[in-house]
Amino acid sequence: MYWKTSPARSSACPRSLLLSARALLFGGLLLVAATSPAVAQDGPAADAGERPEEHSYVAIGVSGTDLGPLNNRLSANGYPTFSTELLSIGGGAYRVVAGRILLGAELNGLLAPSQGFEGRDVFLGGGYGLLSLGYWIEPTPRLRAFPTAGVGAGGLLLNIGDDGSAHFDDVLADPNRSATLSTGSLLVSLGAGLEYQFGTPGGDGLRLGLRGGYLLSALSSDWQLGQSRLGGGPDASMQGPFLRLTVGGVRAALGDATGNKQ
């Protein structure tokens, strides 16, 4: 379920949401970098003289969305529709402080295959950023599990443009040949993950993981064309389940493999 803002406030909502997401993300990264070493000094890792867990990863998977009303409006006007399951590509970083608390940040982009329509190219995509908090569990020295909750913001973008076949005279006859529509929302993520560490436990070796959960959308804005609000737009959001494969430690693993051959 998601909610729309009032018309009086929604004209500036996508931009403010995206600015808030960026500020939240970068502020969180700075907070993690600044505070986690101090917190970790009192944790088990500090007692053992070890550095805290700190890793980055890339992720690819699928993310469900709520595009029903948007697809209905596109279909009613003769345009192609899009699958509600979009390709998700992104990455993130996390740090484990005090031995158990996981602090993370991630960015994900959502993509759908572009569609052709009467000499036009119709594209749907989006993206969002999240700051997350989780609890670190180690069933075995190489296996990690972690429930997480995150907050952030993001937006969807619908672009209708030329497919590359237009001539100069076509543009003169119809200069308004493209349009980019956007909408934004605040997001809450609830999920969990698993990660397996290859090589030395707690080292920098290859790590394979799986993350899944559900993304909730709140305070969705009206659609915008450039800087202008569009009234009467259909509901659309990134709300839905997600599942992603994560890979980390590739550079370290390749470095170890190269060193072993020398």
Where do the language-model regions lie?
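Residues on the lipid-exposed face of transmembrane beta-strands in outer-membrane beta-barrel proteins
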Residues: 91-97, 105, 131-135, 149-153, ...
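Cleavable N-terminal export/targeting peptides
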Residues: 1-52, 253-262
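Residues embedded in well-ordered secondary-structure elements
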Residues: 29, 82, 122, 136-138, ...
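Outer-envelope beta-barrel architecture signal
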Residues: 50-56, 97-101, 141-147, 184-186, ...
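Extracellular/periplasm-exposed beta-strand and loop segments of Gram-negative cell-envelope proteins
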Residues: 65-83, 106-129, 154-187, 217-242
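Predominantly the C-terminal beta-signal and adjacent terminal strand-loop region
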Residues: 195-262
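Short glycine/proline- and aromatic-enriched beta-strand/turn motifs that initiate or cap beta-hairpins
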Residues: 37-98, 248-253, 261-262
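Mid-length scaffold segments of soluble, non-membrane domains
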Residues: 127, 139-141, 146, 152, ...
